[in-house]
Structure formats: C-alpha cells, structure tokens
Amino acid sequence: METRKVQKVGYSTLSVSLPMNWTKKMEIKKGDLVFLSEETDGALRLTVEPGKIEDNAVYMVNVDNCDNAEVLARVIVGNYVLGRNVIKVYSSRRLMREQIESIRRVTQRLLGIGIIEESERHLILQCSIDPNKFPLETVVRRLYVITSIMFKETMNSLIDGDMELAKDAITREYEADTIYWLLARLLASAQQSRLVSEGIGIKDPLDIVQHSIIAWYGNDRR
C-alpha cells in the first residue's frame, strides 16, 4: 500500500498525486478522465475510462498437454468462464480432426465466442460479449425457467414413455449449460471489475457469492 500526502491547491481545493507506476500501466495522460466512487466502508475507488481496461491479452492453450478432446473442451470452457476474451489453441504438430471438432462443438455451446483465425497448428477464439447487455437477474431467471421446463419434460417423458419429449429435455440441458457458463463468466468478471459488477446490477460484493450459489444449484442436475 502506498501513501500520499494531501495537498491544498488554491483556496479550498485538496489534491492527491497518482502513483507513477499505476498511471503508466493504465496509460494515463494529461486531460484523461478518472472516476471516483465511494465504497460502503467510506473508501474511495479510483477507476479509468471503461475502454482503457479492456483485456487484450491472448491466453494460450497447449493441446499437447490435453490428454483427450474432452479435456481440451473443458480447458476452453474454463478460460471462457474466467472472462478471457482471446484464447489461442495451439499444438507443436498438425491439429487432429477430433481436436478441431471438439473445439467447434464447444464454441457452439458458448455464447458470444467464435473462431477468428485458423491454421494447421492453431486456432484463435475471440469472445465479444458486452457484460452490460446481460443484467444478472435476467440471466438467473432464464436459467431457472430452462431447468424448470427441462425437469417437467424429463418427468413427463418417463411417465408417458415419450421419446420425443425426452429429446427436448436433452436439448434444454445444452441450453442450460450455455446460460450457466455465461452466468459464471459474468460473476467472474464482476469480481475483477467494479464497472462490470455495476453494469450487470451487482451493488454489494456479497451478491456475487449468493448468485454463484444460486447458479450452481440451478444447474446441478445430478
């Protein structure tokens, strides 16, 4: 933690200098806007313009370290849930058809992500989700509705011996996974960014924990 001495500028204005390392990291320059928000405990939170904090890092996934295509798919889902926007999947040799098909299948089940570049040895996935367009309560409600319908369809298919209804329930399961992974991504992003948490409707950090529990039980179909 760094300390700064409060200086008086003019008749009544108080000022505090910003840490140089932080201003360089955030690429702050003269004339830029910074935003102050008061926390519930009285602390002040300083943030830069929303566009400046965009994560442009490329996260690497080495296929050679994945035992099979299922593990590869799980790794991609994990990176998506953690809020990563650009994921490069690569191998020291030509990607196998099974691996490519696994990547394509999993990206079809993840909202807002797609393949933007491809070669024999790598694929680049990019997620273009704007968290502010997904209010948390709306996403949670959607997950609840899907799982409720899926449960009813499953029970009715067993009672009536209706195979078509059973197939509908399986389709709902895939849709529930998609919404659950989106919800998990939003909550992970909210933990990392106050701007995201405010954008999706979280006012108290404890809400993140509560919604994580709700999401887990809402998608638990054991």
Predicted feature descriptions by range:
Residues E2-V6, Y11-T13, S17-R222:
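Cytosolic, long alpha-helical scaffolding segments
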